[in-house]
Amino acid sequence: MPNTSSASKRLRQNEKRRLLNRATRSNMRSTIRRVREAVENNDLETAKNEFKVAQKKLDRAAANNLIHKNAAARTKSRLNNLIKNAAQTA
């Protein structure tokens, strides 16, 4: 229970930010999952389109300190390699 008005305000801000971050993180993970599923189903067009969306969401999350910039770069690299390998085998 907050004892001061500033503590009450921080509590409200933290809750609001937590919900926004949670939604953003969930959205980002869903997009990454769609890329992986498209690659598994050998649907390279969809995979490439979803990858573009995933790149944007990962960069936005890194810019807002939701994830580390290196984690975003690593995830983008791995997704890109997945798509490239699927294209070579197809």
From Swiss-Prot:
<protein>
    <recommendedName>
        <fullName>Small ribosomal subunit protein bS20</fullName>
    </recommendedName>
</protein>
<dbReference type="Pfam" id="PF01649">
    <property type="entry name" value="Ribosomal_S20p"/>
</dbReference>
<keyword id="KW-0687">Ribonucleoprotein</keyword>
<dbReference type="GO" id="GO:0070181">
    <property type="term" value="F:small ribosomal subunit rRNA binding"/>
</dbReference>
<keyword id="KW-0689">Ribosomal protein</keyword>
<dbReference type="GO" id="GO:0005829">
    <property type="term" value="C:cytosol"/>
</dbReference>
<dbReference type="GO" id="GO:0006412">
    <property type="term" value="P:translation"/>
</dbReference>
<dbReference type="GO" id="GO:0003735">
    <property type="term" value="F:structural constituent of ribosome"/>
</dbReference>
<dbReference type="GO" id="GO:0015935">
    <property type="term" value="C:small ribosomal subunit"/>
</dbReference>
<comment type="function">
    <text>Binds directly to 16S ribosomal RNA.</text>
</comment>
<keyword id="KW-0694">RNA-binding</keyword>
<keyword id="KW-0699">rRNA-binding</keyword>
<dbReference type="InterPro" id="IPR036510">
    <property type="entry name" value="Ribosomal_bS20_sf"/>
</dbReference>
<dbReference type="InterPro" id="IPR002583">
    <property type="entry name" value="Ribosomal_bS20"/>
</dbReference>
<feature type="region of interest" description="Disordered">
    <location>
        <begin position="1"/>
        <end position="28"/>
    </location>
</feature>
<comment type="similarity">
    <text>Belongs to the bacterial ribosomal protein bS20 family.</text>
</comment>
